[in-house]
Amino acid sequence: MSEGTTTGTQEFWEGFYQDRDQIWTGKPNPLLVREAASLDPGTALDLGCGEGADAVWLAGLGWRVTAVDVSSTALRRAAVHAEQAGVGERIVFAEHDLAQSFPDGEFDLVSAQFFHSPVAQDDERTKVLRRAAEAVGIGGVLLIAGHAGWPSFIEDRHDVHFPTMDEVLDGLALGADWSVETKDAVEREITGPEGQVGLRTDTVLRLRRVR
């Protein structure tokens, strides 16, 4: 399904995924695993699902997942991954440019893992995250993981703004209906595409809608 995609955004991410047969490892994001493993399964929305590793992991735990991405190539790979993992019936894949369209419904978990885009402005990201918060049902969780900066081995650092956790929270402006359950920065060792080894700091917010 394709709804309201912006040509520049779609072209960028299609090119990104078509450049190689597989971009990601096929494993779920560690911060998702850390923060969601203890949650009771329900309905989940995976924003920018890519090749589907997070959605497949959630479905394997019993979640019913709506997984969206702007790239049809990524979604095809994600659907294959889900079928191979035996959880295809628990995941609905849908094509969305989230700046233009958003899945209907309320969810027990809305996950935005490393929701960064070189073809989107900070205000667009904030608008999407606000819409993500609106999609969380009472008692549900909004989980946002992001990069705090460049990997240590990157020397040519482009002028990119990595929002801080406080900036994300200020942009969401959630108010008294929400509680902050996790606000954490995690340094991890990573390996770059050319075998470089270094450190990168990621941030994670787990926010619960209490009423």
List the model feature ranges, each with a label.
Residues M1-L39, G42-G50:
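Conserved class I S-adenosyl-L-methionine
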Residues A55-L98:
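Class I SAM-dependent methyltransferase SAM/SAH-binding core
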Residues F102-L109:
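A short acidic, Gly/Pro-enriched loop at the edge of an enzyme's catalytic core
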Residues S111-Q113:
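A conserved beta-strand element that flanks and buttresses the S-adenosyl-L-methionine
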Residues P118-R131:
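A short, conserved alpha-helix within the catalytic core of class I
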Residues E155-D177:
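Conserved Class I S-adenosyl-L-methionine
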